[in-house]
Each structure stands twice: as structure tokens, then as C-alpha cells.
Amino acid sequence: MSFFSFFVGEKKKSASVAKERLQIILAHERSGRNAAEPDYLPALQRELMAVISKYVKINLEDIKVNVERQDDLEVLEVKIELPDSR
């Protein structure tokens, strides 16, 4: 870098500008995806329903699937309300 370009400033090349923009977009999408509910949860809930209903009669409302974020971990929580065996 020359002394003159230090004061005037260099014009960034379009490739480096595009790369910076892409990095910002990717970081934004990744952070947004973590905050929202994963898109596989409804399918997971239906598949659990299909497997469990082979053995026990339950309704779809009896299965709750949730993802919680704790620090750097994602916890998948599955709650299944089984009918009384009486």
C-alpha cells in the first residue's frame, strides 16, 4: 500500500465486496435458522405417530416434539402421552 493510497483510500474490487456480502447473508441465514423451529419437526412427529400407533392407540395431539437451544447445544424433547393401561 502506498502512502498516497493510505489517505485517498483504495477502491475495493467487486469480488471482495461480493464475498463480504455473501458472508453476511450466510451468517444472517444461519442465525435465523437456529432461532426458528426446524422444518423437520412436523415430519418427525408424524413418523413417531406412525411407529407408536403400531403398538398403542394414540392421537397426534398426544405427541409433542420441541427443540430447545441451551448455550451451544440443541436439545430435542419428545413428550408422548400414553393412554391408561386399565
From Swiss-Prot:
Pfam families referenced in this protein's UniProt entry, alphabetically: MinE
The entry's family comment says: Belongs to the MinE family.
List, in alphabetical order, the GO biological process terms annotated in this UniProt record: cell division; regulation of division septum assembly
Which pairs of positions does the record mark as disulfide bonds? none
Q: What taxonomic ancestry is recorded? A: Bacteria, Pseudomonadati, Pseudomonadota, Betaproteobacteria, Burkholderiales
Can you name this protein? Cell division topological specificity factor
Function, as annotated, reads: Prevents the cell division inhibition by proteins MinC and MinD at internal division sites while permitting inhibition at polar sites. This ensures cell division at the proper site by restricting the formation of a division septum at the midpoint of the long axis of the cell.
Keywords on record: Cell cycle, Cell division
Domain of life the protein comes from: Bacteria
> Which Gene3D superfamilies does this one have?
Cell division topological specificity factor MinE
